[in-house]
């Protein structure tokens, strides 16, 4: 997750500065992702590595993959290098397709798969990134109407179940696949803030206006 946050920050820094050193780092991160982080056989990104970039855990993080797909596309767009568009676009398309087929159940996205065992909890940030990720996939490949439908269905799930409708509240940290909240999770704490869901709202507004 660290490289992705660096990439996200460098993307916006390069957008406003066009600094050559920042561009160099963006390209380096994309190269590392394509050559070390992305697993083409499993069409997913690996999560934890040793110092030589060997994967050390069998974990498919569905939320990180759908988030990464649109973040990479955004960075490549801002980078403006055709070679990187050709290199990265097939990867982000594969990530989006794989998540749609293995993790989306028609209305929301499961959390992750750890050593073959799927965690079906619906985590607040995963649901937020799902809306952006599938809308991004549809914008890139408008023939894939299922991505548009998935983004709309996810948004309905969020409104009906992920949002805590109590006055002054926020989104539930997690609910089960039927939308029932887990009561032991706080609404806000150091690992739970409105970053992902706030960004989702702003991102969707920009994309559909």
Regions inferred by a protein language model and the residue ranges of each:
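Glycan-recognition and catalytic cores of secretory/periplasmic carbohydrate-active enzymes
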Residues: 1-209
